[in-house]
């Protein structure tokens, strides 16, 4: 007989909306900061390490114990497998889209200007990059909905963790848009537009999963577990390690983990 799990206590819609707005606003603020004074690679690597530690802490301290406690191995295997397959499939799709766009831009590159002080022309929108970022943020929103499906505490901590991640994403996206020749205001506006995908994802997640119980909830939490682990190991830490590793950068990961471990204990 399949195991049933008690219903998680989910917070009101207004609370979930507020916690969904927080990461989106911080992402826009990160973009504004980047166009005003772009942070150095060391600082961005430190933010990525810290965000990875925070999310890993939420996974290990909040989600994983809830999943293990209910002893539903088949549901866990199904949800976890679906999570890994989904993240791998999305990465394959977005990488192909970005490569296709890069090939098109290389073939249509304009001849260099003869003027010594000529500014780079404003590029068309990098749709491959924006679609990849939009999907990434949409998944973050879904994960936030999954977090609140597990409970108010789990959702709140995950919202704070994703806020740190999206700060880094806002910084990186704005910097890349500026390097492509987009103006400061346009770069921030593009980031603001993509940040709306977080609200869409969170809305879908909370609508579909609100009141989820039993085996469905266990599958969903296991899916979120796999997706968050993928986010930490294959995105945040991979990007963080593009910068030469130092003891202080490594320490940022453990500071983030310890901080949210303690926060989870006292909250």
Residues of each region from the PLM?
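Intrinsically disordered, metal-sensing/regulatory segments
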Residues: 1-267
């Amino acid at each position: 007989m399949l195991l049933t799990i008690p219903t998680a206590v989910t917070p009101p819609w207004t609370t979930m909306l507020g916690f969904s707005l927080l990461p989106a606003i911080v992402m826009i603020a990160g973009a504004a900061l980047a166009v005003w004074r772009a942070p150095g690679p060391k600082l961005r690597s430190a933010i990525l390490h810290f965000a990875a530690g925070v999310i890993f802490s939420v996974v290990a301290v909040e989600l994983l114990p809830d999943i293990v406690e209910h002893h539903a191995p088949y549901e866990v295997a199904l949800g976890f497998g679906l999570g890994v397959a989904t993240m791998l499939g999305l990465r394959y799709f977005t990488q192909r889209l970005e490569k296709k766009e890069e090939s098109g831009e290389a073939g249509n590159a304009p001849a260099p200007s003869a003027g010594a002080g000529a500014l780079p022309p404003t590029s068309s929108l990098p749709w491959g990059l924006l679609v990849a970022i939009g999907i990434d943020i949409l998944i973050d929103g879904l994960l936030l909905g999954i977090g609140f499906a597990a409970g108010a505490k789990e959702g709140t901590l995950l919202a704070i963790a994703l806020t740190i991640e999206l700060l880094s994403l806002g910084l990186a996206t704005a910097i890349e848009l500026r390097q492509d020749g987009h103006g400061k205001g346009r770069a921030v506006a593009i980031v603001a537009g993509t940040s709306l995908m977080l609200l869409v994802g969170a809305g879908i997640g909370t609508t579909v999963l609100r009141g989820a119980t039993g085996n469905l909830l266990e599958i969903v939490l296991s899916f979120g577990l796999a997706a968050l682990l993928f986010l930490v190991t294959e995105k945040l830490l991979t990007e963080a390690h593009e910068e030469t590793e130092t003891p202080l950068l490594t320490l940022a990961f453990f500071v983030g983990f310890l901080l949210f471990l303690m926060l989870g204990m006292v909250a």
